[in-house]
């Protein structure tokens, strides 16, 4: 499988380095880390998010598996609960395939942000703040791990500060 990327102009690119190039029968030289279009061999600047460059916002269903298992395995009854559905908006764009079929697409980053509960002004069941016990917030992790939400926030900010100062190194 090979993932498609888009640039700021909306042009689609098949980047070299996509995992599908790893198992080609005949080596094409496209299993590498160069950010180039595998078809045209031209470099491009990929768009990280469709937010602000989208055709529409769409609801995506995510599953919250928090209560589907027991964290105390010695007392587990072996019975589980169903996952809870969480609906969150993501920015999307419509593209046409070569056979004229229309597809609705988004970026992996936009899906990741929605899964993690980072609203970016989008609609849906996003956490209101760090104290909201929805999945992946400091309040949620405190209930799951016993680690204080304030400590989790502090550590997260220190990681971010270090990344900024070292430019990600």
Residue positions per predicted region:
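Long, well-ordered, tryptophan-enriched scaffold segments
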Residues: 1-165
């Amino acid at each position: 499988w090979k993932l498609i990327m888009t640039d700021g102009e909306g042009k689609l690119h098949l980047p070299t380095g996509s995992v599908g190039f790893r198992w080609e029968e005949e080596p094409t030289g496209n299993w590498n880390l160069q950010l180039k279009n595998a078809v045209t061999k031209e470099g491009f600047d990929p768009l990280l998010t469709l937010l602000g460059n989208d055709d529409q916002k769409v609801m995506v269903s995510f599953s919250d598996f928090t209560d589907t298992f027991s964290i105390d395995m010695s007392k587990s009854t072996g019975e589980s609960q169903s996952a809870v559905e969480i609906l969150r908006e993501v920015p999307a764009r419509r593209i046409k395939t070569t056979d004229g079929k229309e597809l609705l697409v988004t970026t992996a980053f936009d899906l990741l942000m929605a899964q993690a509960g980072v609203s970016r002004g989008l609609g849906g069941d996003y956490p209101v703040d760090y104290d909201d016990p929805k999945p992946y917030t400091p309040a949620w992790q405190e209930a799951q791990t016993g680690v204080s939400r304030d400590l989790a926030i502090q550590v997260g900010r220190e990681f971010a500060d270090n990344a900024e100062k070292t430019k990600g190194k």
